[in-house]
Curated annotation (Swiss-Prot):
Major subcellular site: nucleus
Protein name according to UniProt: Spindle pole body component SPC42
Low complexity composition bias: residue spans: 319-329
Compartments in which it is found: Nucleus; Cytoplasm, Cytoskeleton, Microtubule organizing center, Spindle pole body
Keyword Nucleus assigned: yes
Entry-linked Pfam families: Spc42p (PF11544)
Any GO MF annotation of the entry: structural constituent of cytoskeleton
Gene of this entry: SPC42
Keyword vocabulary terms for this entry: Coiled coil, Cytoplasm, Cytoskeleton, Nucleus, Phosphoprotein
Region ranges (Disordered): 160-184, 310-363
Residues bearing the modification Phosphoserine: 213, 217, 284, 329
Family: Belongs to the SPC42 family.
Transmembrane stretches, start-end: none
Compositional bias segments (type: Polar residues): 170-182, 349-363
């Protein structure tokens, strides 16, 4: 029992379940349970009967609306992600399209320039062929013929009855023969000069391939123009050469090119790494070699100093005894030789000493 003069001051309403046993208001009565879903007996109270049907329908409708809202938000996010990805793809395709348009323009310009060059070369070739033909086969001029031939009036011509045998020749035929002989001589001279020129050009070509080609002939003019322009066919598959390449072909070609470049970069990195390792190894070996050489130079200097400072008179070895004077002992060579000479005794004296009876010392 609370012995305080003011007991209500120390009791609170929130702690009814934990009141003292001697508290009079709750001594013979059960306090109300904290969980309102259960009655005093312990059975569950059916609260659904208390809630009206309209409230239930409203809650169900609200729950369904909330669920639908969540689903729609999820679908909206998915659609937004798809739109974002499509925008990225469209930007990449647009950039590629611009690049390919620029490439096509450049190729068209190059093609136009090449066509102009080909037309110029063909014109030069035709001019050279025509000049060569003119030089090789010049036009033979017809003999001089009078435009207004004199009408033959045999009545007015006085022909002698007795002509000399040498005078029977026609002057026109003699003129023709002389003209043909002159033309033959000219042709021969032109052929000789042409042969000399061709030989000179061939020699100059053999001496220097960068000079001009020899005079065009019907044989070497048949060569294709592509060989003269040094055109080379692409060795690798290139879809951009096609007239209308597909996007898949272009992307595959670009990915292959990127892969090839990456492989080349990796190969170069590997070579550089190996070279660095070799350089480091070379430096370490050079340092080690210098250290060993310095150590050997230092040991040689120490040995020379010891030999110069060595005094055989005061030298004492641990193995210096009457029995140890072999060259394999610790003594140096000179000391061992001296020791051998000192201890060398004749065999007779040595034997007598061994068999002699010991004499006692004089007291």
């Amino acid at each position: 029992m609370n012995g305080s003069p003011t007991p209500k001051r120390y009791s609170s309403k929130s702690s009814r379940l934990y009141d003292d046993y001697y508290n009079i208001p709750y001594q013979y009565s059960n306090p109300t349970p904290m969980n309102r879903d259960y009655n005093d007996v312990g059975s569950r109270i059916n609260a659904d009967k208390l809630v009206p049907e309209e409230y239930k329908r409203n809650t169900e409708f609200i729950n369904k609306a909330v669920q639908q809202n969540k689903e729609l938000n999820f679908k909206l996010r998915e659609k937004q992600n798809e739109i974002f990805e499509l925008k990225k793809i469209a930007e990449t395709l647009r950039s590629k399209l611009e690049k390919y348009v620029d490439i096509t323009k450049k190729l068209e310009d190059q093609n136009l320039n090449l066509q102009i060059k080909i037309s110029d070369l063909e014109k030069k070739l035709s001019d050279a062929n025509s000049t060569f033909k003119e030089m090789r086969f010049p036009k033979v001029k017809d003999p001089m013929v009078d435009d207004d031939p004199v009408s033959e009036n045999y009545d007015q011509i006085n022909v002698p009855k007795h002509r000399a045998p040498d005078a029977t020749g026609n002057p026109r035929t003699t003129n023709k023969v002389s003209n043909t002989s002159d033309q033959d001589s000219r042709l021969k001279a032109i052929e000789r000069t042409l042969s000399v020129l061709t030989n000179y050009v061939m020699r100059s070509e053999d001496g220097n391939n960068d000079r001009m080609s020899p005079l065009p002939s019907p044989l070497n003019t048949i060569l294709p123009i592509n060989n003269r322009l040094n055109f080379q066919e692409p060795k690798r598959y290139n879809p951009t050469v096609k007239v209308n390449p597909s996007d898949d072909d272009i992307m595959m070609y670009e990915s292959a090119e990127l892969k090839r470049v990456e492989e080349e970069i990796e190969e170069l990195k590997r070579k550089i790494l190996v070279r660095k390792k070799h350089d480091l190894r070379k430096l370490s070996l050079n340092n080690q070699l210098q250290e060993l050489q310095s150590m050997m130079d230092g040991d040689d200097n120490i040995k020379l100093d010891n030999v110069s400072k060595h005094n055989h008179a005061t030298h004492r070895h641990s193995s210096q005894s009457s029995r140890d004077y072999s060259p394999s002992s610790d003594a140096c060579l000179e000391c061992s030789n001296d020791l051998y000479e000192k201890n060398r005794v004749k065999p007779e004296n040595n034997m007598s000493e061994t068999f002699a009876t010991p004499t006692p010392n004089n007291r």
